[in-house]
Design a protein with these regions (language model features):
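C-terminal active-site rim and adjoining tail of enzyme catalytic domains
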Residues: 2, 33-45, 112-192
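Metal-dependent phosphodiesterase/phospholipase catalytic core, i.e.
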Residues: 4-111, 115-119, 131-134, 138, ...
């Protein structure tokens, strides 16, 4: 379940739910009552880890303050759990909050990091290098052939967000990004 980050730093429930307001203002019990489009319930990260069990790559986006250490503790338990298929290379951590990424990197250098940015993608290169990130994930509208080339030359993969129209998906393929973040994976007629 995704949410919208406000300019003030809070996370709003998106238009795909039956509730409005800051996620931080809801208790876990209240969030359990939120209905996502199609009548689905919002899963906890722990429920997602149990369900997926390492069968696919998982992008965990840190969206709130003080989420880095809690996320590290939770995923580490799954790495160590008997019968778990989770390994550090099956998860990556991303965030627009670069301070949270720094905190995560201080305690866990095994799990890959991707830098999310809504500003000039080139501004993310220094923090990406500092944190040993594997990818920079910018707003797709900020990508040009020159920007893509500079990011690639700096050693990063690119997974732009949120690429939803068929035309934009094709443009990202032409720019030779590694993959995309989309709300409509069924619109992708071939893999990147």
């Amino acid at each position: 379940m995704d949410s919208l980050k406000t300019k003030l730093g809070g996370c709003l429930l998106g238009v795909l739910t039956n509730r409005n307001g800051l996620i931080e203002s809801f208790s876990l019990d209240s969030l359990r009552k939120v209905s996502v489009l199609g009548g689905y319930q919002i899963p906890t990260l722990e429920e997602v880890l149990q369900l997926v069990n390492g069968e696919v790559m998982l992008n965990i986006e840190l969206k709130g303050d003080q989420t880095a250490l809690l996320t590290h503790e939770l995923i580490t338990r799954y790495f160590d759990r008997e019968g778990s298929q989770w390994k550090p290379e099956r998860i990556f951590i991303s965030s627009f909050d670069w301070d949270e990424l720094k905190i995560f990197y201080e305690v866990n250098k095994e799990v890959p990091i991707a830098i999310l940015t809504e500003d000039d993608p080139l501004d993310a290169i220094p923090i990406g290098l500092q944190l040993g990130a594997f990818a920079i994930n910018p707003d797709f509208e900020k990508l040009t052939p020159e920007v893509v080339q500079k990011i690639h030359q700096s050693g990063f993969e690119i997974y732009p967000w949120t690429v939803n129209t068929s035309e934009d998906i094709e443009r990202m393929k032409m720019l030779r990004v590694k993959g995309i973040i989309t709300d409509f994976p069924d619109r992708i007629n071939q893999t990147f």
